[in-house]
């Protein structure tokens, strides 16, 4: 299979060195039998620098560029933990990532273009590579009827259609550094390309494997 992961930067940044090694080992296990791409988010590092940039009057486009640099730093950190299982040089384009996959069974990258979140980059990469599965490993354990951090009555949706996901996510305002289970652009790409997608809690490293063997407790998205 070809599997593309969108790994939230907040998930990765919360790990100490031992935690990073656990994620690296899980990804190596998955890559034994699959071609794996991992797109890493910027997390708190990106939000901190984007916040400071806004404070000094930076445009949203410049804030996006700063966020991309943060994602690439996080990607480089994960690549270092993978210790040769993925290229140390972080690809900066989809073509670079696909070229690297000719040599490596695992490729780790960050953001690509201003205006695209990590989820959107991962969805586009899944589209480019005709991926079998897109896994969005984030800080929530699926898609809910509303924000579970704000609404105690929010209910997790175990399965949903791509069109329903796109409709739900289109109501979320998208700015540099914004957070949502799946961003609106990614949802549109998932819908148009019929990409099988799973949203899982990436804070549990075991969910990276469970997402592909069907034993996860997240949200499955199908066309």
From Swiss-Prot:
This is Uridylate kinase. It comes from the Archaea. InterPro entries: AceGlu_kinase-like_sf, Asp/Glu/Uridylate_kinase, Uridylate_kinase, Uridylate_kinase_arch/spir. One of its GO terms (molecular function) is ATP binding. Keywords: ATP-binding, Cytoplasm, Kinase, Nucleotide-binding, Pyrimidine biosynthesis, Transferase. It catalyses: UMP + ATP = UDP + ADP. The keyword Cytoplasm applies. The keyword ATP-binding applies. It is found in: Cytoplasm.
């Amino acid at each position: 299979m070809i599997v593309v992961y969108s790994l939230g930067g907040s998930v990765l940044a919360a790990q100490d060195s031992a935690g990073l090694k656990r994620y690296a080992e899980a990804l190596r296990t998955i890559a034994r039998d699959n071609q794996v791409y991992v797109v890493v988010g910027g997390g708190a590092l990106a939000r901190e620098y984007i916040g400071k940039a806004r404070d000094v009057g930076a445009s949203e486009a410049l804030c996006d560029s700063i966020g991309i640099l943060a994602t690439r730093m996080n990607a480089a950190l994960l690549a270092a933990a993978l210790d040769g299982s993925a290229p140390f040089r972080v690809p900066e384009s989809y073509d670079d990532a696909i070229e690297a996959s000719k040599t490596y069974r695992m490729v780790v990258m960050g953001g690509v273009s201003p205006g695209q979140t990590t989820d959107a980059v991962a969805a586009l990469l899944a589209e480019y590579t005709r991926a079998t599965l897109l896994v969005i490993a984030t800080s929530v354990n699926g898609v809910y009827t509303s924000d579970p951090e704000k609404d105690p009555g929010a209910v997790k949706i175990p399965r949903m259609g791509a069109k329903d996901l796109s409709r739900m996510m289109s109501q979320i305002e998208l700015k540099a550094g914004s957070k949502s289970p799946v961003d609106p652009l990614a949802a549109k790409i998932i819908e148009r390309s019929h990409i099988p997608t799973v949203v899982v809690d990436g804070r549990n490293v075991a969910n990276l494997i469970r997402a592909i063997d069907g034993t996860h407790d997240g949200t499955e998205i199908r066309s």
